[in-house]
Amino acid sequence: MDEEGVHKPAGPPTRKKFLIPTDEDVVPPPGAKPLFRSTRSLPTVETSPPPGPQTYAEYALSGPPGGAEATRPVGPEPLAEETPNQAPKPGAKSNSIIVSPRQRGNPVLRFVRNVPWEFGDVLPDYVLGQSTCALFLSLRYHNLHPDYIHQRLQSLGKSYALRVLLVQVDVKDPQQALKELAKMCILADCTLILAWSPEEAGRYLETYKAYEQKPADLLMEKLEQDFVSRVTECLTTVKSVNKTDSQTLLTTFGSLEQLIAASREDLSLCPGLGPQKARRLFDVFHEPFLKVPH
């Protein structure tokens, strides 16, 4: 018995247990905010590794892990503010180079500065004109995925009259790969162009677009229409006869008729001509235009 008359049990004193209610056990009244956030119902957040390069151009520069057996990357969907334009039909006019979204991130685009370009939903990598398109290929990527360019050329078909395969040479020994690509381009009726840097590849794309509306006269040989120029062009087709010799012959004989009628000795007496040139000229003047079968 203690001083207050409470009976104490015999033996060692026992410890009392206290239960402290937690926020999970007690239902808070409406409108009350808990002091601590409960960790019982937090959702599990799964961490995923950062995505690797998703475009073909980024892959060509960095290369994904997995070697040659890695799956070929597919370009990501464009953002809302970067939605590509609708695909222009072959033959439609455009002032810009239309770039496929799969080329997003390609360093070549940084060097396309002299002509405008924009993303568009197109089948080739670059649409350079009404009837001109280009596919871009890195040799490093081609060595890992040799079937890639076969599928691209097959899907492209004959939609464009001029199909360019723009190859960036970024490997040490490109001879064998270029030999195979050259054979492929012959069979696919495709033009093969080699670039050794992204800057050079960008200049090729710019040039194709800038010269889209230019006539072919810039690439053709300019022929003079006056008589002396035409005779000079004709005489210089004879081996070792140059423009100076042609002018000397015209000055000496006065006309093309008298020049053709001259003997071999008369031709050899012209200054700077000599017997060898005279013999060649004489043989050309007196041989038939068509060989008569014997």
UniProtKB/Swiss-Prot annotation:
Renumbered residue ranges of the record's region HhH2, dimerization with ERRC4/XPF? 220-294
Keyword field contains Ubl conjugation: yes
The record's DNA-binding region positions are 130-152
Locate residues linked as Glycyl lysine isopeptide (Lys-Gly) (interchain with G-Cter in SUMO2). Answer: 17, 33, 239
An example molecular function term from Gene Ontology annotations: damaged DNA binding
Q: Where is this region: Disordered?
A: 1-99
**Motif window: Nuclear localization signal:** 13-19
What protein am I looking at?
Answer: DNA excision repair protein ERCC-1
